[in-house]
Amino acid sequence: MEKKVIAMAENYGISNYIVYSSFCHASMGLVKKLDKNAKTGLLSTNILDAIENQEQYHADALYPCNVGMAINRETVQYLKERNIPVRVWNGQEPLFGQVRPLGKCDLERYTLLGATDLFTNVPENYLE
């Protein structure tokens, strides 16, 4: 599958605009092996799991769920020293097409914990 996705991105001329991301960290390692210039991110419900796999799979970014952000000052320092973006996603967000209330994500708290970015299905909820 990874070969086909990379080939499709190359076909459309969009390879430089894509960050491949997956909960399957080994898949992102394969993407890197197939295309050393590909940007990859590791989705995870736990930041520590993502950090553990980051070096093994040469990921460019980590994508922990906001409820999995139990990290300490040393972990934040480790990530900053390596310029590894930590892009948090709110595990309480509805998926596209779902209608349910959204639990508020404490953006300031996650910034203090080391989050560098937030990605979301509902950006309008964070514009203030």
Question: Predicted regions span which residues?
Answer:
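Short loop-to-alpha-helix "cap/lid" segments that border enzyme active sites
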Residues: 1-128
